[in-house]
Amino acid sequence: MKQLNVHLISDYGVDALIAVSRASLERFEHLVSAEHHLWPSTTSIEKLQQVFLHIERSSFVLYSIRERIIRDTLKDFCQKRKIPCIAVLSRVIRELSSYLGIEPIHTSKEEYQTFNEDYFARIDAMNYVLTHDDGQNTWDLDEANIIIVGPSRTSKSPTSVYLSHLGYRVANIPFVNNIPLPAKLTTLENILIVGLTINPDRLIEIRKARLSISQNYDNPVYADREQILEELTNARKTFIKNNWPVIDVTHRSVEEIAAAIMKEYTMRKY
């Protein structure tokens, strides 16, 4: 049985890489013994160079990295050492077959095309959204493509999920009166931060419906008109102060909100 060291390198999570590696190696079941080495959050040349210390010549590298300079550095390192270095889903099974000298079991052209880079970019993006919903895990906001800020019930979460299906890593953060936003927001570069606002009457209507559904009547200020007016006013002031584009979501569908955000994203060329 052949031994194989598989290094999985990503600028975020490695779940997608693990999935495709295992699915590919199943074609060589009982023929190859593989050991996986996981290198998530490889977001800089410095981090990549630390990974290099662990890659031996008898290795197989799979990667998913968006930053061109990091990709090129990895490919150059592997090329000089004649180490196979494959972008995920660039004919992974075919490359494994060539490297190992073993014909894969029950493969077809269609199976090679089952997945593609966009699919796994979406998987990574969805994982990011789920772990960065409603202000969670603000420590790595610099990994996001887009950050959405807005009061409760302004469609932050569904819009984030929708954008993740397009392959964008999106975090959303609630704006709440008298609770400061993460200080990190003012230091981020090359990340689109957008503020969502809404007509106060519409927001009152939505929040009252929410309270009725949840039967949570212990928070009367949640749908109080004066509180909502103050919250929306303060939110808009914060957005303008930080030069964040403001998008009014009143009577807009999630698709329309996402389209407006993508327009800002494209205009600013992030």
From Swiss-Prot:
Annotated binding of ADP, by residue: 150-157
An annotated Gene Ontology molecular function: protein serine/threonine kinase activity
Top-level EC class: transferase
Enzyme Commission number(s) of this protein: 2.7.11.32, 2.7.4.27
Pfam annotation, one family: Kinase-PPPase
Keywords of this entry: Kinase, Nucleotide-binding, Serine/threonine-protein kinase, Transferase
Catalytic function, reaction form: N(tele)-phospho-L-histidyl/L-threonyl-[pyruvate, phosphate dikinase] + ADP = N(tele)-phospho-L-histidyl/O-phospho-L-threonyl-[pyruvate, phosphate dikinase] + AMP + H(+); N(tele)-phospho-L-histidyl/O-phospho-L-threonyl-[pyruvate, phosphate dikinase] + phosphate + H(+) = N(tele)-phospho-L-histidyl/L-threonyl-[pyruvate, phosphate dikinase] + diphosphate
InterPro entries: Kinase-pyrophosphorylase, PPDK_reg
Family to which the UniProt record says this protein belongs: Belongs to the pyruvate, phosphate/water dikinase regulatory protein family. PDRP subfamily.
Cited function: Bifunctional serine/threonine kinase and phosphorylase involved in the regulation of the pyruvate, phosphate dikinase (PPDK) by catalyzing its phosphorylation/dephosphorylation.
Protein name: Putative pyruvate, phosphate dikinase regulatory protein
